[in-house]
Amino acid sequence: MDIQRFLKFYKVGWKTYRDPLMEASHSSIYYWREQMKAMALFTTTEERLLPYRSKWHTLVYIQMVIFFASMSFGLTESMGDHVQMGRDLAFILGAFFIIFKTYYFCWYGDELDQVISDLDALHPWAQKGPNPVEYQTGKRWYFVMAFFLATSWSFFLCILLLLLITSPMWVHQQNLPFHAAFPFQWHEKSLHPISHAIIYLFQSYFAVYCLTWLLCIEGLSICIYAEITFGIEVLCLELRQIHRHNYGLQELRMETNRLVKLHQKIVEILDRTNDVFHGTLIMQMGVNFSLVSLSVLEAVEARKDPKVVAQFAVLMLLALGHLSMWSYCGDQLSQKSLQISEAAYEAYDPTKGSKDVYRDLCVIIRRGQDPLIMRASPFPSFNLINYSAILNQCYGILTFLLKTLD
């Protein structure tokens, strides 16, 4: 692992935060990708051609199969203990989510890389030259937001990993960070102390590696949609200030034509992004809903035990927090995209321009009336309205369980 390459995002982010006049040379998604490359788990054709990279990817996939199979086998030991089964199922769902994402981006790595390259090439979206629109404030805000997102996530991830790895030291019924079972009872400390130590180290290392990779891919995914949202904001700025240069008819026609193409490029990249993340968006919606339902079920069943209720309440909040983050990001994308038609309407000036200019503005107005959405068909789009519907559904499940058990 290339530590310097991995930490570059934090160094650049801190310098950008400290110096208001400093501009990062790349967008945040470029640095997220660099972190995944530093971990040797950015699965593109180009990366697999590097020395030993393909072998490392294969080794990681084998470790994932072993990790998931041992946890699934450990579930059989929890039969009869509903609380322990709930914990095991929660970790199994989380492990399955990570494994699915890893294998998924093994197939879609090249498409993801192309989306990142296209977005980074268009960044900061504004037309270069004299007197550009004031995009620096938005660019800085999105980059610093990504930096603080990465920093806060990393901080809480370190706490979570510390609790997981040290849990056998303060939880008497647990002898491994994750409940698992191996053939010949290799996981039993009293029978096989050496193999138990190896399994302990394997689970600790693999949890650190996989959860760090998950943080990077989640940050990358969120920031890709945030970058598209920033592109929409710049497009709106340029539309509202299209007459700032006092263009002649020919120059104004060229400018409106460029903005039509920029709008089309944003729509095209969003469509490709939704295609790339189609499987993962469906999976995370399913996993989050499953974790929330499982947490509600276990908390209701063990409602007389405050410790158990607190554990599953935290799990439920984590799942809802993850879903709310994606819903908010999708909602912002949709809301900002609806401002495009308003900005194009403001750009209309009957005293300036020609029929071709008005036609270009009409094209943007017509396209801008349809909101751009983060969606994985056939499921509904990610926004706060659908998020509220999910919360209502969870509340309905909780009410039903309480009435049934009472």
From Swiss-Prot:
Which Gene Ontology cellular component annotation is one that this UniProt entry carries? dendrite membrane
Which of UniProt's keywords are assigned here?
Answer: Cell membrane, Membrane, Olfaction, Receptor, Sensory transduction, Transducer, Transmembrane, Transmembrane helix
Subcellular location(s) per record: Cell membrane
Q: Which residues lie on this side of the membrane: Cytoplasmic?
A: 1-55, 110-144, 240-275, 329-381
Checking Pfam families in the record gives:
7tm_6 (PF02949)
Example GO BP = signal transduction
What are the transmembrane regions? 56-76, 89-109, 145-165, 219-239, 276-296, 308-328, 382-402
GO MF terms, alphabetically ordered: ionotropic olfactory receptor activity; odorant binding; olfactory receptor activity
Q: How does it sit in the membrane?
A: Multi-pass membrane protein
Q: Which ranges of this chain reside in the Extracellular compartment per its record?
A: 77-88, 166-218, 297-307, 403-406
Record's subunit section: Interacts with Orco. Complexes exist early in the endomembrane system in olfactory sensory neurons (OSNs), coupling these complexes to the conserved ciliary trafficking pathway.
The function of this protein is:
Odorant receptor which mediates acceptance or avoidance behavior, depending on its substrates. The odorant receptor repertoire encodes a large collection of odor stimuli that vary widely in identity, intensity, and duration. May form a complex with Orco to form odorant-sensing units, providing sensitive and prolonged odorant signaling and calcium permeability.
Tell me the protein family, please. Answer: Belongs to the insect chemoreceptor superfamily. Heteromeric odorant receptor channel (TC 1.A.69) family. Or49a subfamily.
What more the UniProt record tells us is: The atypical heteromeric and topological design of the odorant receptors appears to be an insect-specific solution for odor recognition, making the OR/Orco complex an attractive target for the development of highly selective insect repellents to disrupt olfactory-mediated host-seeking behaviors of insect disease vectors. Odor-evoked OR currents are independent of known G-protein-coupled second messenger pathways.
Would you tell me the protein name for this molecule? Putative odorant receptor 65b
Which gene is transcribed and translated to give this protein? Answer: Or65b
